[in-house]
Amino acid sequence: MGKFTVLNHPLIQHKLTLIRDKHAGTKEFREIANEIAELMVYEITRDLPLESIEIETPMGKTIQKQLAGKKLAVVPILRAGLGMVDGVLRLIPAAKVGHIGMYRDEKTLKPHEYFVKMPPDIEQRDLIIVDPMLATGGSANMAIEALKKRGATSMRLVVLVAAPEGVKAVQAANPDVDIYAAALDDHLNENGYIVPGLGDAGDRLFGTK
Protein backbone atom coordinates (compact mmCIF):
# COMPACT_ATOMS: atom_id res chain seq x y z
CA MET A 1 0.00 0.00 0.00
CA GLY A 2 1.20 3.51 -0.80
CA LYS A 3 2.34 5.55 2.15
CA PHE A 4 0.45 8.49 3.60
CA THR A 5 2.59 11.26 5.06
CA VAL A 6 1.66 14.44 6.89
CA LEU A 7 4.40 17.03 6.40
CA ASN A 8 4.79 18.64 9.81
CA HIS A 9 7.39 21.27 8.91
CA PRO A 10 6.72 24.31 11.14
CA LEU A 11 6.48 26.72 8.19
CA ILE A 12 3.96 24.48 6.43
CA GLN A 13 1.82 24.26 9.56
CA HIS A 14 2.00 28.00 10.22
CA LYS A 15 1.06 28.95 6.68
CA LEU A 16 -1.78 26.43 6.60
CA THR A 17 -3.25 28.06 9.72
CA LEU A 18 -3.16 31.42 7.95
CA ILE A 19 -5.29 30.22 5.03
CA ARG A 20 -7.67 28.18 7.17
CA ASP A 21 -8.80 31.47 8.73
CA LYS A 22 -12.06 32.52 7.10
CA HIS A 23 -10.89 36.14 7.12
CA ALA A 24 -7.97 35.44 4.76
CA GLY A 25 -8.64 37.24 1.47
CA THR A 26 -8.22 35.90 -2.05
CA LYS A 27 -4.77 37.43 -2.57
CA GLU A 28 -3.46 36.12 0.74
CA PHE A 29 -5.00 32.68 0.22
CA ARG A 30 -3.56 32.36 -3.29
CA GLU A 31 -0.06 33.47 -2.35
CA ILE A 32 0.18 31.29 0.74
CA ALA A 33 -1.27 28.21 -0.97
CA ASN A 34 1.57 28.42 -3.49
CA GLU A 35 4.11 28.94 -0.71
CA ILE A 36 2.86 25.79 1.02
CA ALA A 37 3.01 23.85 -2.25
CA GLU A 38 6.62 24.93 -2.74
CA LEU A 39 7.58 23.83 0.77
CA MET A 40 5.77 20.52 0.38
CA VAL A 41 7.45 19.67 -2.91
CA TYR A 42 10.83 20.51 -1.38
CA GLU A 43 10.07 17.92 1.30
CA ILE A 44 8.74 15.16 -0.97
CA THR A 45 11.60 15.35 -3.47
CA ARG A 46 14.24 14.36 -0.90
CA ASP A 47 14.37 10.86 -2.38
CA LEU A 48 15.01 11.88 -6.00
CA PRO A 49 18.00 9.94 -7.39
CA LEU A 50 21.28 11.67 -8.16
CA GLU A 51 24.11 10.85 -10.52
CA SER A 52 27.70 12.07 -10.75
CA ILE A 53 28.86 14.18 -13.67
CA GLU A 54 32.06 15.99 -14.51
CA ILE A 55 31.87 19.76 -14.89
CA GLU A 56 34.42 22.54 -15.07
CA THR A 57 34.31 25.47 -12.67
CA PRO A 58 36.42 28.62 -13.15
CA MET A 59 38.98 26.84 -10.96
CA GLY A 60 39.12 23.50 -12.77
CA LYS A 61 37.36 20.17 -13.35
CA THR A 62 35.29 18.50 -10.62
CA ILE A 63 32.80 15.68 -10.11
CA GLN A 64 29.41 16.91 -8.86
CA LYS A 65 25.81 15.69 -8.52
CA GLN A 66 22.77 16.23 -10.70
CA LEU A 67 19.27 14.79 -10.81
CA ALA A 68 19.03 11.40 -12.48
CA GLY A 69 16.18 9.15 -13.53
CA LYS A 70 12.79 10.28 -14.78
CA LYS A 71 11.99 13.91 -15.44
CA LEU A 72 9.23 15.61 -13.47
CA ALA A 73 5.80 16.91 -14.38
CA VAL A 74 3.16 18.61 -12.26
CA VAL A 75 -0.52 17.80 -12.87
CA PRO A 76 -3.11 20.05 -11.22
CA ILE A 77 -6.67 18.79 -10.87
CA LEU A 78 -8.71 21.73 -12.16
CA ARG A 79 -9.64 24.15 -11.05
CA ALA A 80 -8.37 24.36 -7.47
CA GLY A 81 -5.14 22.51 -8.28
CA LEU A 82 -4.04 25.51 -10.33
CA GLY A 83 -3.53 27.30 -7.04
CA MET A 84 -0.52 25.10 -6.25
CA VAL A 85 1.23 24.99 -9.63
CA ASP A 86 3.27 28.19 -9.40
CA GLY A 87 4.72 27.09 -6.09
CA VAL A 88 5.87 23.80 -7.57
CA LEU A 89 7.34 25.49 -10.64
CA ARG A 90 9.32 27.95 -8.53
CA LEU A 91 11.19 24.95 -7.17
CA ILE A 92 11.21 22.84 -10.37
CA PRO A 93 11.04 25.37 -13.23
CA ALA A 94 11.84 22.79 -15.92
CA ALA A 95 8.88 20.56 -15.03
CA LYS A 96 6.22 20.04 -17.69
CA VAL A 97 2.60 20.78 -16.74
CA GLY A 98 -0.41 18.63 -17.55
CA HIS A 99 -4.03 19.40 -16.70
CA ILE A 100 -7.00 17.29 -15.63
CA GLY A 101 -10.40 18.96 -15.42
CA MET A 102 -12.88 17.58 -12.89
CA TYR A 103 -16.09 18.85 -11.38
CA ARG A 104 -18.09 17.35 -8.55
CA ASP A 105 -21.82 16.77 -8.77
CA GLU A 106 -23.16 18.62 -5.74
CA LYS A 107 -25.95 16.07 -5.22
CA THR A 108 -24.15 12.77 -5.71
CA LEU A 109 -20.65 14.07 -4.79
CA LYS A 110 -19.36 12.02 -7.75
CA PRO A 111 -16.58 13.49 -9.93
CA HIS A 112 -16.90 14.03 -13.67
CA GLU A 113 -13.94 14.41 -16.03
CA TYR A 114 -14.21 17.10 -18.69
CA PHE A 115 -10.62 17.82 -19.80
CA VAL A 116 -7.27 16.01 -19.98
CA LYS A 117 -4.12 17.46 -21.57
CA MET A 118 -0.77 15.82 -20.83
CA PRO A 119 2.86 16.02 -21.97
CA PRO A 120 3.48 13.48 -24.77
CA ASP A 121 6.14 11.64 -22.76
CA ILE A 122 4.02 11.10 -19.65
CA GLU A 123 5.20 7.50 -19.26
CA GLN A 124 8.78 8.77 -18.86
CA ARG A 125 8.01 11.23 -16.07
CA ASP A 126 7.47 11.26 -12.33
CA LEU A 127 4.12 13.00 -11.88
CA ILE A 128 3.24 15.26 -8.97
CA ILE A 129 -0.55 15.51 -8.84
CA VAL A 130 -1.72 18.58 -6.92
CA ASP A 131 -5.12 19.43 -5.46
CA PRO A 132 -5.70 21.46 -2.30
CA MET A 133 -8.32 19.10 -0.88
CA LEU A 134 -8.57 15.31 -0.64
CA ALA A 135 -12.17 14.86 0.50
CA THR A 136 -14.00 11.75 -0.74
CA GLY A 137 -11.08 10.70 -2.93
CA GLY A 138 -13.30 10.43 -5.98
CA SER A 139 -11.61 13.15 -8.04
CA ALA A 140 -8.13 11.97 -7.08
CA ASN A 141 -8.89 8.38 -8.04
CA MET A 142 -10.43 9.41 -11.34
CA ALA A 143 -7.41 11.59 -12.12
CA ILE A 144 -4.98 8.80 -11.27
CA GLU A 145 -6.86 6.33 -13.47
CA ALA A 146 -6.91 8.83 -16.34
CA LEU A 147 -3.14 9.20 -16.04
CA LYS A 148 -2.58 5.46 -15.89
CA LYS A 149 -4.63 4.99 -19.05
CA ARG A 150 -2.27 7.40 -20.78
CA GLY A 151 0.82 5.49 -19.70
CA ALA A 152 1.81 7.07 -16.38
CA THR A 153 3.57 4.68 -14.00
CA SER A 154 5.04 6.96 -11.32
CA MET A 155 2.77 9.34 -9.40
CA ARG A 156 2.56 11.16 -6.08
CA LEU A 157 -0.50 13.00 -4.80
CA VAL A 158 0.12 16.26 -2.93
CA VAL A 159 -2.75 17.97 -1.07
CA LEU A 160 -3.03 20.71 1.51
CA VAL A 161 -5.77 19.10 3.60
CA ALA A 162 -6.95 15.48 3.59
CA ALA A 163 -9.93 13.72 5.15
CA PRO A 164 -9.53 10.16 6.47
CA GLU A 165 -12.24 9.02 4.05
CA GLY A 166 -10.31 10.31 1.05
CA VAL A 167 -7.02 8.81 2.15
CA LYS A 168 -8.63 5.40 2.59
CA ALA A 169 -10.36 5.62 -0.79
CA VAL A 170 -7.17 6.45 -2.69
CA GLN A 171 -5.11 3.84 -0.86
CA ALA A 172 -7.75 1.20 -1.60
CA ALA A 173 -8.07 2.01 -5.31
CA ASN A 174 -4.46 3.02 -6.05
CA PRO A 175 -2.10 1.43 -3.52
CA ASP A 176 0.89 2.31 -5.71
CA VAL A 177 0.43 6.07 -5.22
CA ASP A 178 1.96 7.85 -2.22
CA ILE A 179 -0.08 10.66 -0.64
CA TYR A 180 1.40 13.75 1.02
CA ALA A 181 -0.69 16.24 3.00
CA ALA A 182 -0.07 19.32 5.08
CA ALA A 183 -2.82 18.15 7.45
CA LEU A 184 -5.14 15.22 8.12
CA ASP A 185 -8.45 16.64 9.32
CA ASP A 186 -11.30 15.07 11.27
CA HIS A 187 -14.03 14.00 8.84
CA LEU A 188 -16.36 14.93 5.98
CA ASN A 189 -19.68 16.62 6.68
CA GLU A 190 -22.97 15.68 5.02
CA ASN A 191 -22.11 17.87 2.02
CA GLY A 192 -18.75 16.21 1.44
CA TYR A 193 -16.67 19.09 2.81
CA ILE A 194 -13.66 18.52 5.03
CA VAL A 195 -14.08 19.53 8.68
CA PRO A 196 -12.51 21.75 9.97
CA GLY A 197 -10.93 22.17 6.52
CA LEU A 198 -10.53 25.56 4.90
CA GLY A 199 -13.76 25.92 2.94
CA ASP A 200 -14.06 25.65 -0.84
CA ALA A 201 -10.46 26.00 -2.01
CA GLY A 202 -11.41 26.88 -5.58
CA ASP A 203 -13.73 29.68 -4.52
CA ARG A 204 -11.20 31.06 -2.05
CA LEU A 205 -8.40 30.94 -4.64
CA PHE A 206 -10.34 32.66 -7.40
CA GLY A 207 -12.79 34.87 -5.50
CA THR A 208 -15.90 33.05 -6.70
CA LYS A 209 -18.93 31.53 -4.99
From Swiss-Prot:
Q: Which domain of life is it from?
A: Bacteria
Pfam (any one): UPRTase
Reaction equation(s) it catalyzes: UMP + diphosphate = 5-phospho-alpha-D-ribose 1-diphosphate + uracil
What does the UniProt record note about how this protein's activity is regulated? Allosterically activated by GTP.
The free-text function statement in the UniProt record for this protein reads:
Catalyzes the conversion of uracil and 5-phospho-alpha-D-ribose 1-diphosphate (PRPP) to UMP and diphosphate.
* Segments passing through the bilayer: none
Binding locations of uracil = 194, 199-201
Family in the record: Belongs to the UPRTase family.
Q: Do you know which SUPFAM superfamilies this protein is assigned to?
A: PRTase-like
What name does UniProt use for this protein? Uracil phosphoribosyltransferase
* One GO-annotated biological process of the protein: uracil salvage
Report the record's disulfide bonds: none
**NCBIfam families per UniProt:** PRK00129.1, upp
What EC number is given for this enzyme? 2.4.2.9
Q: Does the keyword Ribonucleoprotein apply?
A: no
| Co-factor note (free text) | Binds 1 Mg(2+) ion per subunit. The magnesium is bound as Mg-PRPP.
Task: Recite the UniProt keywords alphabetically.
Answer: Allosteric enzyme, Glycosyltransferase, GTP-binding, Magnesium, Nucleotide-binding, Transferase
Cofactor dependency: Mg(2+)
Q: Which gene encodes it?
A: upp
Citing just one GO molecular function, the answer is: magnesium ion binding
**Any idea which positions bind 5-phospho-alpha-D-ribose 1-diphosphate?**
79, 104, 131-139, 200
Q: Say which species the protein is native to.
A: Lacticaseibacillus paracasei (strain ATCC 334 / BCRC 17002 / CCUG 31169 / CIP 107868 / KCTC 3260 / NRRL B-441) (Lactobacillus paracasei)
Q: In which pathway does it act?
A: Pyrimidine metabolism; UMP biosynthesis via salvage pathway; UMP from uracil: step 1/1
